[in-house]
């Protein structure tokens, strides 16, 4: 009986040691990976497409929230402090307005171009209307798929610098991702070439589609220019309504991350319907249409071209 009890205890001890060993192995594997932080869901998704499971990834601004003006949570501060690599958009997105990202990296004692990098480096910057100076840049460069490719290339470059052992994986994933984005970009240009010129205008709440407009030859109009200024004032709405009454624009669009009430007022005053919500500052929730950078852009391109072709 004693011998039997001893064997049972020995077996339990062995199982416990095996479990601890397995847990330790899993922990060691996770801790050996790069700790990477991205400021928003779009940058995080591009990073994930290149890095796969080779990194530990944290995205700061939650899906559906505005990256222009965010208040980091304690978890964001902790992850940023421990990060080996931090990706931010740049072009005055996270550093404009309340400058939340500037404060975050300063408090974490992180250094630019050593610990954190702008993924927009190399993009042909577009400025806010009537402006051409630092601090007046339009940050929404990712809405041009060619810029999305630049983002991906910059992310891959920094991952390889920090983690050369996984260079082959990063380069392979980058190549496949670029091919995917390039094909969608070509498809988009063909779609918008077939829309009559008098219908060709994308109307949104925020004036975020400038890069989109330039890439796909679709003029844009908006209620307010950028989310760090007043949003949806009576004068802003009146100005857009007067502009639209002189056009044959068939559809309006409203972004997923803004209050839709100002655009509903524009729709009522012009009798132009809101065709769809589109994604500009964030991807969609997991499992929904637009829950990755690629699917977000495809969704936008499909909805906008459909709405303007009506």
Curated annotation (Swiss-Prot):
Annotated residues for binding of Mn(2+): 68, 140, 206, 281
GO BP, sorted A to Z: cell adhesion; metal ion transport
Task: Please state what is observed when this gene is inactivated.
Answer: Inactivation of the gene results in both impaired growth and strong inhibition of Mn(2+) uptake.
Main localization of the protein described in the UniProt heading: membrane
Which molecular-function annotation in GO is an example for this chain?
metal ion binding
Q: What induces it?
A: Induced at low concentrations of extracellular Mn(2+) and by the addition of Zn(2+).
Coiled coil location: none
Going by the UniProt record, its keywords in alphabetical order are:
Cell membrane, Lipoprotein, Manganese, Membrane, Metal-binding, Palmitate, Signal, Transport
PROSITE patterns on file: PROKAR_LIPOPROTEIN (PS51257)
Q: Lipidation annotated as N-palmitoyl cysteine: which positions?
A: 20
What compartments host this protein?
A: Cell membrane
Residues making up the signal peptide according to the UniProt record: 1-19
Repeat keyword on record: no
Say which domain of life the source belongs to: Bacteria
Sorted alphabetically, which InterPro entries does this protein's record hold? Answer: AdhesinB (IPR006129), Bact_metal-bind_prot9 (IPR050492), Lipoprotein_PsaA-like (IPR006128), ZnuA-like (IPR006127)
GO cellular component, alphabetical, reads:
plasma membrane
Q: Which Pfam families match?
A: ZnuA
Topology in the lipid bilayer: Lipid-anchor
| Covalently lipidated residues, kind S-diacylglycerol cysteine | 20
**Cited function:** Part of ATP-binding cassette (ABC) transport system ScaABC involved in manganese import. Essential for growth under Mn(2+)-limiting conditions. Also acts as an adhesin which is involved on adherence to extracellular matrix. It is an important factor in pathogenesis and infection.
Protein family according to the UniProt entry: Belongs to the bacterial solute-binding protein 9 family. Lipoprotein receptor antigen (Lrai) subfamily.
Q: How does it assemble?
A: The complex is composed of two ATP-binding proteins (ScaC), two transmembrane proteins (ScaB) and a solute-binding protein (ScaA).
Against PANTHER family, the record matches this protein to: HIGH-AFFINITY ZINC UPTAKE SYSTEM PROTEIN ZNUA-RELATED, METAL-BINDING PROTEIN HI_0362-RELATED
This one is known as Manganese ABC transporter substrate-binding lipoprotein scaA
- Which species does the entry assign this protein to? Streptococcus gordonii
Q: In the UniProt record, what gene is named as encoding this protein?
A: scaA
